[in-house]
């Protein structure tokens, strides 16, 4: 078992502005699917109001209608993908994205390819994307012809043997889907490091719960960066001009022993797949306090929602909402057991909802 595989896995585990900001918000459940799923990806709303998503544990790609409760399985899951396999086949569907022209991209984590589908659920072709900075898939797309990739290669390894690279910043690459041209559109702050120990091996690793920057893009190519150390959102217009947001004060939550135990248990569980002995000594670097947010998702209307960390794993989630001018607007508490999964038209907010037996389903909410 390679130490870097465990380190990488643990690192992963890890519109117009209102003139007056609202202090609180709430959600009303409008509809949810009657069936349950093992583990869900993000949710993408289609033009007719239906949704597309993947079950990342059962490895299936779905289209669903929240009004009727109807569920369609798209394409075919296979155990291996040939080089010339049709677009209808996938091995590990892990992420869904909306592209231009009424098309949807399905990112296959295992086959390391992205397939293009129409909104009727028909496969169109394999999307040719220039391979830059390693084999990690492109997850972010706009509707004007670009994909976006965060260049984590220097952090996760792959450089010269015996040489450790710890960059101060991590570039975000913009890749033209037609011509393959690549440029850098943003830079994220580099993460904080500490020593991780697996048995008798010691290696630098990213600190768990330390602040990280997140990148996203709106359909028209407007990009944003949520700054973890400053707790703010900066915006990049399509012409390259930047607007620096305003930092928002937050209450720092301490990293507890319970938090540490939970993360290390997840590392051990993941290590089983690589044959890691369960009695192996495992230590991991942790931050003293939790970052102001641990997830960020952009809304097509020009908002960015930042997911606050929780004092306890069972606590309900709350999101801080920033507008396109970089100002904090409001907080939105979610019902217990639900988490943000995507956005849609006419104010639709999609969430993963726990069903009580460890499974999840998809629900559509509206702001009260």
Regions found by a protein language model. Name each.
Residues 1-7:
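Bacterial N-terminal signal peptides that target proteins for export
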Residues 18-368:
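Eukaryotic scaffold repeat domains enriched in small/polar residues
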Residues 7-15:
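Bacterial N-terminal signal peptides
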């Amino acid at each position: 078992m390679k130490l870097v595989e465990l380190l990488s896995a643990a690192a992963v585990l890890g519109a117009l502005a209102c003139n007056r900001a609202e202090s609180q918000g709430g959600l009303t459940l409008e509809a949810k699917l009657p069936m349950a799923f093992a583990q869900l990806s993000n949710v993408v709303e289609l033009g007719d109001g239906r949704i597309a998503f993947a079950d990342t544990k059962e490895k299936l790609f779905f289209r669903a209608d929240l009004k009727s409760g109807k569920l369609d399985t798209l394409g075919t899951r296979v155990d291996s993908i040939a080089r010339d396999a049709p677009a209808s086949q996938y091995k590990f569907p892990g992420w869904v994205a909306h592209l231009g022209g009424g098309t949807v991209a399905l990112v296959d984590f295992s086959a390391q390819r992205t397939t293009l589908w129409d909104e009727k659920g028909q496969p169109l072709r394999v999307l040719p994307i220039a391979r830059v900075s390693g084999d990690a898939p492109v997850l972010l797309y706009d509707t004007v012809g670009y994909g976006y990739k965060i260049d984590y290669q220097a952090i996760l390894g792959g450089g010269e043997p015996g040489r450790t690279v710890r960059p101060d910043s991590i570039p975000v690459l913009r890749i033209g889907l037609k011509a393959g041209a690549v440029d850098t559109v943003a830079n994220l702050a580099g993460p904080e490091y500490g020593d991780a120990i697996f048995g008798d091996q010691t290696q630098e690793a990213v600190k768990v719960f330390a602040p990280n920057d997140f990148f996203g893009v709106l359909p028209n190519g407007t990009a944003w960066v949520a700054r973890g150390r400053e707790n703010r959102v900066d915006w990049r217009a399509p012409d390259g001009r930047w607007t620096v947001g305003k930092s928002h004060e937050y209450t720092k939550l301490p990293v507890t022993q319970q938090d540490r135990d939970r993360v290390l248990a997840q590392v051990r569980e993941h290590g089983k797949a690589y044959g890691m002995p369960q009695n192996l000594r495992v230590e991991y670097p942790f931050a003293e306090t939790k970052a102001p947010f641990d997830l960020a998702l952009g809304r097509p209307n020009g908002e960015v929602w930042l997911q606050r960390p929780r004092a306890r794993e069972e606590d309900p989630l709350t999101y801080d909402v920033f507008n396109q001018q970089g100002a904090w607007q409001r907080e939105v508490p979610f019902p217990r057991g639900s988490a943000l999964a995507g956005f849609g038209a006419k104010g639709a907010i999609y969430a993963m909802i726990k069903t009580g037996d460890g499974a999840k389903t998809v629900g559509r909410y509206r702001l009260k």
